[in-house]
């Protein structure tokens, strides 16, 4: 078996990492806000795609650039290290409200200088009434606004941040280079017919792409010039040589395809960076990096030996730390659902390729190098994912477990055995299905060929819909009734449990439809107001169709719905079925009163203990609850299938919805807005995250958990089925334990058809100490949901949620 070196970092990489993790309250950068405002004001006569292209070009030409930390990969998002840019075209309302309190937010604090406050107070008023968020609220119906105000449905993220959740076509970029991409645009423009309305709009889009690609080239040359200037003043010969190489790399990739591994990695990083300058959307991912960079790695490391493996790993480390520098500021409410300010920049390795119609294992030496580099660095970025398949070698699986044992929540593992065949059933070409990658948290898509948002825009609070089901359609938190129904526990008029399920079906269909209606508004406003030019240029077939992704330019376009509180739904329904209807141990009105009073008082607390201990819980391989949850969830899946997204019929294959379970950290704020539930959960406490069991309810070990998850209709939940498991570090101390985990992984994926799994390998005691002494644990990384975060950067509520999760042994 290959033994990875997992305890080695070069001095400069260690210093760079420590410098970043000790930035507790990063600054805000207003350069982008100022530059975009200037260009929008100057070019009001231009079509929006051209206006946005000119704004991005102006910003790339004028913004502050720097090279620090003896880095080998260069490029900064903002004027200061880890500073978060402001994107006023999406929203200014929360910025103006929260600007003076940003430093005091728990787990998501930012420092704002007086000068930056002055700039924001200067630029924000101009944007009032014309941001994406403002225009969404101008289009929402009163009913939609009321639903959003209650928080049963939450859709703030895309109104205030944009889309993303995709990987662009890095292989095409590497093949053609920036000049080659401009030539592709020029050829398409040569076939434009300006007497055709669609082509008239298409010409403006293609013109915008050319402006942006030229700006990206010039931006690369700015870094080349800076590196040369720094080299002249550098006294260390080795660093001077590195700076000159950086300059040469940046000059070459400004126009030509890269020739070396270093150049290829630099070009990919520049694009990754500028995508996150163009748009504030997160989960911009690299796709299958071990596949498209391997030819360069093979040439430099294996054949010509112009670069040794350790040098290649240091280049990867430099790239990973540059990803960690990228930052994003969210509103106070949105930051609670994305605890730890994550960017979800996913890198996928492993899996299979389709060669002459036959699947072949895709693992190569770069797969191991990327895996090892992440294991050594133990950072939150990139979000590393491994594609598992039945033919994966024990050697590579063993290497993955070695890194899992490092305890930073990576790699997450996705399952080819379910994703690929289900993608092919959808209508994805087999060659593309075998080329899928993890996106953001656990979502999956085909890099460079899939539209935005392979995961949904809005979250539905399943627990609150369930409570409305039990109480005449009344939302227990707000008191509002959106879909009235006859039956209510407080009336004692449910004749049987079948009526409960029937009312659930009606309620979840209503809320699902309303979430799609809301997404339609947001999608439309994003399409009309914030064309993402560079991103569209690097997704097939946007150039050929002369359409942005939002206009239907992508080859594929499916979107998943999202929800929070899956396990709470199953556990609550199971408790009601068994204790109220099957046994008659608890009366309908008795339960309604206990829930309304949050189990206050001795009698209600005794009832609560019966709900907790006397009813089955999801995660323990109990069919009575697992199958009930699957049945309730199936209604949601079936309803989603009824709808098309706004790109349907406009070009892409697909254009439909399917389910997904990535709840990020929304289970904590959603729980804070949810009253007591029949599973015994108290009001205002966290809900279950993803498809994982509710904290503390999975008592029979990890094997029982994976069996329960496998009973969900995973083949229909193509947006991903997120399973977090927490293991005590002592569980993986010896070779025998490692083998147990490997067997568990193979069983989960091959027998139970699991979609995804990830592990926290950290003890409760360590987490409690880190909460008590944060300065001593700044580099402690934990798995939150489909992403990892620095534990001390999380809010206390999210820290407590992670501490409370069940700690298993093998």
List the model feature ranges, each with a label.
Residues 221, 225-228, 574, 807:
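Short amphipathic alpha-helical segments enriched in leucine
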